[in-house]
Amino acid sequence: TDYNIVLLPHVLMPADNDLDILETIAHEKKNERIRLLFEHLSAAEYKYVISKAELCIAARTHVTIAAYSSCVPTLAIGYSTKAKGIADDLNLEEYVIDVEEDKLQQKLEEQFLKLYKNKRQLKEQLKGKIPQYIQNATPQKLLDFLKEDMR
C-alpha cells in the first residue's frame, strides 16, 4: 500500500494487551510506512489521531466509535454484537467482519479494497448520519443542561 499505517493500541491490560500483537506486526513487517504509536495519550488525543486517518480498521468498539464520529470510513473487526449493532445503525453493516469468519485474511483484504474504493461515499454518508446519531444517543436532559450552562 501507499498508505502510512499507524498501529494504535487501545487496551493495555496484562490479560488483554493490544500492544503485544501490534509489536509483532510492526516487527514482522519491518516497513517504515508502519508506525506503532505508543505514547501515553489522553482519550481526546487518541480521538484526534483517529480523526486524521483517511481510513480505519479496528477491532475495538471505542476505536470504531471514535472513527465513525469523526466521519472516518471504518472496517470493523467484530468480536461481539456491538460492532454489528453500531454499524447497522449507520447502514454500514457490510463493513463489519466477524473475527470468527472463515478465511478471515481474505475477507479483510476484500473488504479493505471495498472500503478504499468507496471511501469518499462512506465519508459523506457518515457526515450525513453522525449528527443525528449523536443527538439520538445523547439524553435530552443533558442537552438541555448543556444549553443552560452555555448561556
Language-model regions, residue ranges each:
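Active-site anion-handling motifs in enzyme catalytic cores
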Residues: T1-R151
